[in-house]
Structure formats: C-alpha cells, structure tokens
Regions:
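Short, Lys/Arg- and Gly-enriched loop/turn segments at beta-strand edges
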Residues: 73-84
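Flexible glycine-rich surface loops and low-complexity tracts that mediate binding to linear polymers
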Residues: 64-74, 240-241
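Active-site metal-binding core of divalent-cation-utilizing nuclease and nuclease-like domains
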Residues: 95-102, 109, 113, 118-165, ...
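Short alpha-helix capping/helix-loop boundary micro-motifs
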Residues: 46-56
Length: 260
C-alpha cells in the first residue's frame, strides 16, 4: 500500500493516534529532569517518568492539570509516564500540550501514512526510522522516506522531527534552550542536498499556534543555521496537532517565520 493513497486534501481533525484515555492529575513538581510528582483525583501522589530532558519553557506549571499514561512493566521502574500538560493558551483559554519527546516521531510517521503530507512530499512507498547518515555516518535521521515510482521527485527524503512545545503568542518556537545536537542536525540536513531532499518537521504539540519560528532568544546559533538551511533548500513543514485524553488529531500545516 502506498502511504497516503487517495486521501482528501483537507484532513483537519483526523485522529492519527488513539489510545486508552489518559489519567488526569495535578502536577506537584518536576525534579531530576526525568521525574514528576502528580496528585491523582483520589488524592494519591504518584511519581511519573518525564520523557523530556529540556527546560520545558512555558509548559511547566506546578498546580496545573496533567495527563499520565499508566503502563506498568517489569522492564520499567515507573508505571506512570507524563504525556500531556494543560497550559494557558494563546487566546487566554487553556490548551493541552504533548510533553513526551518519544512521541513526535510516531506521530509524524502516522501523519505521513495517513496522507496528511502527500501534497508536500508526494506519494511515499517506504518509511525507515533511525537510519545512519551524516559525517562518518555517526548520526541517525529520524525518518528516511523513499518515493513511489509515480512521485515526480525521485530523490530520497531525509526527515528530521523536532518536538515543539514552547510558544510566544501564536508562534511556536524551537529550541527552548541551546541545542548543539539540533545545530548539528541542521548542518547534516544541508549536507544531503541537492542529491536528496531534506525536510525539517517541527512537531507543534499544541493547537493554539498559527506559525513556527526558530527560538533565537534561546539559541541564536540555531536561528542562524535555520535561516541558512532554509536558504539552502531544506524544506520546513511545521505540523500541528491537538492533544486530547484519548487521541491526537491532525490540525494541518502552519506557516514559517524566519524570525519571531
């Protein structure tokens, strides 16, 4: 099956991932980067795994509502994982944000498979995750896409995903801290041009934003490299999603601003 065959142009609202409803609680504190204490509705306090190593600028609100996934396993120390946080949105109302950085690659893959990006990427035959590339093949690209025979552009597509949760007003920003890894990814994306296509996908894990820009305030060098990459031909596709207790749905592409 070709990914994205015969999908309608407007797919806004299409659920891409559906799961058992998450458990709601109140965030007490986040500490040691990977841990968060959350009080559940019955008053029980649980420690959840926080799969987000960054500062979580603008989305860390002790006393605010959060959603956790319960998945006990002998392989894992903690049975709970922090998935979503409720934050003040751009229009003054509350907005749910996806904070689990392990999710965006799955989400973008699901969007491609559903045909959400067919207009931008063309028809795709295969999607391979975590393929070695770059200098001395020491990096791994998030997704390597192969076009179908009918795709007018026959080049491979190197696609890098960035979980984006920070915003100012209605503009989503990445990064929210200095990221040498992110800088390196931009350089390596430029390196696959022009023989292959290079695509940067900011995964906008909140639905109150209408544009994306590099977070120059947090990492000026990233901003410089972002604009350099854009000028060199790296395609920027900010994908927006709505996060709910039992599903995540496609909200369409957002515009790109070279600067906020």
């Amino acid at each position: 099956r070709h990914h994205g065959a015969s999908q309608p142009a407007s797919m806004t609202g299409t659920p891409l991932l559906e799961f058992a409803p998450l458990t709601e609680g109140v965030l007490l504190k986040r500490y040691k980067r990977f841990l968060a204490d959350v009080e559940l509705a019955d008053g029980e306090v649980v420690t959840a795994h926080c799969a987000n190593t960054g500062p979580m600028t603008g989305v860390l609100h002790p006393g605010g509502r959060v959603r956790l996934r319960y998945a006990p396993s002998p392989k894992r120390k903690l049975a709970w994982t922090w998935e979503q946080a409720e934050v003040p949105g751009a229009d003054g109302s509350l907005c749910w944000v996806g904070v689990n950085t392990a999710l965006p690659n799955r989400l973008i893959r699901a969007a491609i498979e559903a045909g959400c990006l067919e207009e931008q990427l063309g028809a795709i035959s295969t999607i391979r995750p975590e393929v070695a590339y770059g200098e001395n093949r020491r990096s791994r690209i998030d997704l390597l896409l192969s076009p179908t025979e009918t795709n007018p552009d026959q080049r491979s597509i190197y696609l890098e995903v960035k979980n984006t949760t920070w915003s100012e007003g209605t503009t989503a920003l990445f990064p929210d801290t200095v990221t040498e890894r992110g800088q390196k990814h931009l350089v390596e994306l430029m390196g696959v041009l022009p023989g292959s296509r290079a695509v940067l996908v900011p995964c906008l894990s909140r639905d109150d934003v209408d544009a994306f820009a590099p977070g120059d305030e947090a990492d000026p060098r990233y901003g410089e490299l972002f604009r350099e990459a854009q000028a060199a031909g790296v395609e920027i596709l900010p994908c927006c999603f709505r996060f709910e207790a039992g599903r995540i749905s496609w909200q369409g592409l957002r515009g790109v601003k070279a600067r906020n």
